[in-house]
Amino acid sequence: MAGDMMTYETDVVVVGSGPGGSTVARQLARAGQRVMLLEMGRDYRRDILYGSHLGAIVWSDDHGFLFTEEGLTIIRPFMTGGATNMYCGCAALPPVWLKERYGVDLDDWALETVRELQIERLPDDLLGAASRRIMEAGQALGSEWQPLLKFMAPSRAPRFDCGAKCMMGCRCGAKWTANEYMDEAVAAGCTLLTRAGVDEVIIEDGQVGGVRGKLRGRQPFEVRARVVVLSAGGIGTPLILQKSGIAEAGRGLAMDPTVMVYGVSKEAGTAYEPPMTVGCMDDEHGYMLSTLIDPWILYPIMATLKGPSYLLSWRKYRRTIGVMIKVTDEVSGMVSIERRVSKPMTERDRERLHHATVVSRQILVKAGCDPDSIFVSRLRGTHPSATVRLGEMVGNDLQTSVRNLYVCDASVFPEALGLPTVLTIISFAKRLSDYLLRGVLRQEEVRATAATSAASV
């Protein structure tokens, strides 16, 4: 019956199967730990809708219509592998400032992952002709454009077929997703429970005791565990913490606010080229530029949100080139326990966006786009993060104020990354896994053995 509590017991429970959660589950399971991985969504990889426009709507929070109170669109997929199903497969090494300002050195884990997953730039012939024109135009104007590192390998796919549609799920198989680490975790003995929504963490005398939630939205369940790792994302993790009595979670967030600057060329545009193959980072002015365009069906929706007249640009979609602006924003706003998200743009954020927009327009014109065709899309939030910040709400070891309760996802970023986030999250997760295996889990085993011995006396 739906009202009967289902109970489980394990050593470590990991909540969320995105890049953070799947990595922790994989590392710990491979080391022989009893691990249970809980995922709110389902595994859609073999679903007929995977990689389609309709599928992306079906498995996204609020079916793709999740907005901040200020109107920023947020895409938050509920599925195994999390947001890596819908990312562009871009990789960036962890920023140097993590080490310089916060004492967190992720270099070894990042380089290990680069080697393991063969993260590298795409061959020149796969960068895309329009993307190369944008890169050359940017270089001619003084920007340091270059090919970007990718979680994407043509050799993995029977037929390399990447374009704007990659953001809906990779059907050709070239793009790495966290599902692969999840599969490896399960193969190593991890128990995977899908459609398992976690509501709260069990806290007993300042010590974690497990988690509670509902299966399929109605069946109560409880998992008892000695260690809990929350990896439910920049929005999901603070919501769970708030419901568990940790009120400061979600006070302030970063979002890497993003817009596309579109222009129409006489030649083919970027729609049928791999996304974000080239780009540049302007550290001085605080933004990243790359080549990106919304998928065919999403484009008119985003254009209409900008204004009804912009819908007419859809008929020139094949010749449209998109330059993405990702702003390194200041922490502001909040995620509330009622699932409301507020993310106002600060004055500095707006200045950075304005500078990037001017530069992007110049690049598009230099690349041959009609100046009169250029427009800027509606603002959207791409990387909800910094909601459980390292140094404020979690320690250097990612532990919260509750003993053996850890957070490992974009929530722990102490400030906006302003870069592709996945490699940094994986690096944090490998670092945390090593820390748990070296100390915490050994200590818990000793403590459990001692308690059992005392009880038998």
Segments predicted by a language model, with ranges:
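Glycine-rich loop(s) and the adjacent beta-strand/alpha-helix scaffold that form part
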Residues: R30, G41-R45, E200-V201, V211-G279, ...
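FAD cofactor-binding and catalytic pocket of flavoenzymes
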Residues: E69, A83, I246-V358, Q362, ...
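N-terminal glycine-rich phosphate/pyrophosphate-binding loop and immediately adjacent elements
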Residues: A2-E100, G213, E248-V264, R431
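Short hydrophobic beta-strand that contains or immediately precedes a catalytic carboxylate
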Residues: L37-L38, L192-L193, Y406-C408
